[in-house]
């Protein structure tokens, strides 16, 4: 056998076994995230003049991500706002601690997918917004000290994702913005590409 024929047979043999070893389960459809608490479906959107929101944080952010962010996935609760011209499809999670003998929420995480764009948030927040990147994704951060809340808004295919951390001042010394960049960094990979 000539060396050229041997190489051709070797290449053919490799490529056919490569094809045979591909499993049918290796499809491009991602598995849904693991979520232990079911929530009602997202409400109907009206969105006159805007696209519908496809990313639902209540069904697309896994219990693992919520736990890694420091919140209790068993407190998963729908938190939506539907208006005629825009929508927020959201989910809320608590972190509870025993304070003075009572188990109370000391921190809350709210994740809202909206068809309001990042540019619209920039205009609305003006000079109080700071440009940042979350895992390379365009975003802004701002806070509302009077509401004990901090926000990161990231650009998405739907418009933007609003990540809000809030604290209950009487029950914790933590500030709302203390860990929000880490929290947003954990949530960002669930969005796919923007």
Roles of regions detected by a PLM:
Residues 9-13:
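C-terminal motif of bacterial Sec signal peptides marking the signal peptidase cleavage site
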Residues 22-96:
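Extracytoplasmic low-complexity, Pro/Thr/Ser/Ala/Gly-rich segments
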Residues 68, 72-135:
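Short, solvent-exposed recognition patches
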Residues 15-18:
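Bacterial signal peptide processing site
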Residues 21-26, 30, 155-157, 169-170:
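N-terminal accessory/precursor segments of enzymes
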């Amino acid at each position: 056998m000539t060396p050229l024929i041997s190489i051709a047979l070797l290449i053919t043999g490799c490529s056919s076994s490569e094809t045979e070893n591909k499993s049918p389960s290796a499809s491009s459809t991602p598995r849904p995230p693991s979520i232990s608490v079911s929530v009602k479906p997202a409400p109907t959107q009206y969105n006159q003049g805007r696209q519908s929101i496809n990313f639902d944080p209540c069904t697309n952010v896994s219990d693992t991500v919520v736990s890694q962010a420091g919140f209790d996935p068993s407190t998963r609760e729908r938190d939506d706002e539907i208006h005629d011209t825009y929508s927020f499809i959201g989910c809320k999670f608590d972190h509870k601690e025993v304070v003075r003998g009572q188990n109370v929420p000391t921190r809350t995480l709210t994740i809202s997918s909206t068809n309001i764009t990042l540019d619209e948030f920039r205009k609305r927040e003006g000079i109080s917004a700071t440009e940042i990147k979350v895992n390379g994704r365009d975003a802004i951060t701002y806070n509302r000290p009077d509401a004990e809340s901090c926000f990161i808004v990231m650009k998405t295919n739907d418009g933007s994702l609003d990540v809000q951390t809030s604290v209950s001042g009487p029950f914790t010394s933590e500030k709302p913005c203390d860990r929000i960049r880490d929290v947003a960094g954990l949530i960002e990979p669930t969005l796919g590409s923007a």
